[in-house]
A protein has these predicted regions:
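Cleavable N-terminal export/targeting peptides
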Residues: 1-30
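Gram-negative (and chloroplast) outer-membrane scaffold detector with strong preference
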Residues: 68-140, 152-154, 162-168, 198-201
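Sequence/structural signature of outer-membrane beta-barrel proteins
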Residues: 40-50, 81-90, 123-127, 177-183
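Residues that define the transmembrane beta-barrel architecture of outer-membrane proteins
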Residues: 31-33, 56-62, 93-99, 112, ...
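Transmembrane beta-strands of outer-membrane beta-barrel proteins
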Residues: 34-42, 79-81, 115-121, 173-175
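Outer-membrane beta-barrel domain signature
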Residues: 26, 47-55, 88-92, 143-148, ...
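Short glycine/proline- and aromatic-enriched beta-strand/turn motifs that initiate or cap beta-hairpins
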Residues: 19-70, 74-76, 200
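Predominantly the C-terminal beta-signal and adjacent terminal strand-loop region
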Residues: 154-201
Length: 201
């Protein structure tokens, strides 16, 4: 954990230093903002040790981001997502919510705008496991486990926009969410792919 925090600190420091250098060179500090919504899906997996159960499958969800542009390559803002892994075909699920501060670099290459960065924040994992019955009736279920855990979220990202125009982009990105808690956190992990529209101002 200490090594991860050190790496993140170095990344953010490098971003800030590069941003300041770029701003001085281009004589422009604030260069607008962008924001939009994205859908995502990805294959995730978690070993739920207290239940001796391995949860895996497609986790789908939605979310969005807003970022402010400084210099010619640096953005800082906030983003948040919710992602649900449905299990057992009976209403069981693992729902992950996370949000935080996003820092990234971007470059414009013709109609393309690749970017890479990291989001640091927090989230919550809500689990519902139905081992007897399902959610398709009004019967009381006798064997249901519900658990909710907060966590520190660290989410590296890489992606690319296709610039339809100066103000409208289609974005595709990939991430891998890491969660940290003092104990008993069984966060489904794996790569996620996102697609959405981003509007620039």
């Amino acid at each position: 954990m200490k090594h991860i925090i050190l790496v993140i600190t170095l990344i953010i420091s490098s971003i800030n230093l590069y941003s300041q250098t770029t701003e001085d060179k281009d004589k422009s500090v604030f260069n607008g903002y962008d924001g939009g919504m994205m859908l995502h899906t990805g294959y995730v997996k978690a070993n739920i040790k207290p239940l001796n159960y391995i949860a895996e499958g497609a986790s789908n969800g939605i979310g969005g981001a807003i970022r402010f542009h400084f210099g010619q390559h640096y953005r800082i803002g906030t983003e948040g997502y919710v992602s649900t892994l449905n299990l057992m075909n009976n209403g069981s699920y693992m729902k992950t919510f996370w949000a935080g501060l996003i820092n990234d670099f971007y470059w414009k290459i013709g109609k393309l705008m690749p970017y890479a960065g990291i989001t640091i924040g927090g989230g919550a994992l809500t689990d519902c496991f139905i081992f007897d019955g399902d959610n398709h009736d009004w019967e009381k279920e006798s064997n249901v486990i519900i658990n909710k855990k907060p966590f520190v979220a660290i989410d590296p990202i890489i992606g690319c926009d296709y610039c339809i125009s100066e103000s409208i982009h289609i974005t595709v990105k990939f991430d891998y969410l890491f969660g940290f808690n003092n104990k008993d956190l069984y966060l489904p992990t794996g790569p996620r792919a996102y697609i959405g529209f981003i509007f620039f101002h």
